[in-house]
Amino acid sequence: LTRSITVDVRGELADLKDNMNSMIGTLRATTESGREQDWLKTNLARFSDMMQGQRDLLTLGRMLLTELAPLVNAQQGVIYVVEAADDRDQRQLRHLAGYADNGGEPTARVLEFGQGLVGQVAAQGQLIQINDLPPGSVQIESGLLNAAPRSVIVIPVRFEDQIKAVVELASLDQFTASQRAFLEQLSGSIGIVLNTIEAT
């Protein structure tokens, strides 16, 4: 499926060549779509199995990011969980875990609903993806690398109609449609597990 017919012909043979090339293209697209669906289903099942029975919030957050970031080619990630604010009438987002996170002491990081992209996603319940970030916005750092990500995706995690958490991932590449679909579907499973932990 990696080749096309490339002969110089006219008439009926040209039509036949064009039809064959069209069929090859369709078959190639169908095969690729099938691979993406297999990848999606396999990884959703793997994460579901991995999260099953988890009762510790911090362990869940760390495990999720450790497995999720490399799978979707993210080099950095954080997860914030929703909790009651001090006045109990408001909800806020508390930093739970990070993956290659540069941000200092996690327990000190709290965001209000509507504050920054993470807070906005929590307030609206809608995924936000930003591509081609300006230089200097946030940095992905390692011993050899200090680079701005190309794409950031912020995903609401909900159980029924309640926001339970927000996951933010940054990548040096743009997130693909398949990765985005996977993250959206996975967020529902994460919401169920977070609700179960909260209830126990």
Regions found by a protein language model. Give the residues of each.
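Short, charged helix-helix connector/hinge segments
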Residues: 1-8, 12-15, 46-49
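Amphipathic alpha-helical "output/dimerization" segments
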Residues: 15-22, 26, 159-162, 174-195
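Signal-transducing coiled-coil linker helices
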Residues: 50-64, 174
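GAF sensory/regulatory domain recognition
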Residues: 66-69, 76-109, 113-115, 135
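Signal-transmission linkers at sensory-effector interfaces
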Residues: 22, 29-53, 196-200
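Signal-transducing coupling segments at domain and membrane junctions
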Residues: 101-106, 131-151
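A short, aliphatic-rich beta-strand micro-motif
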Residues: 150-158
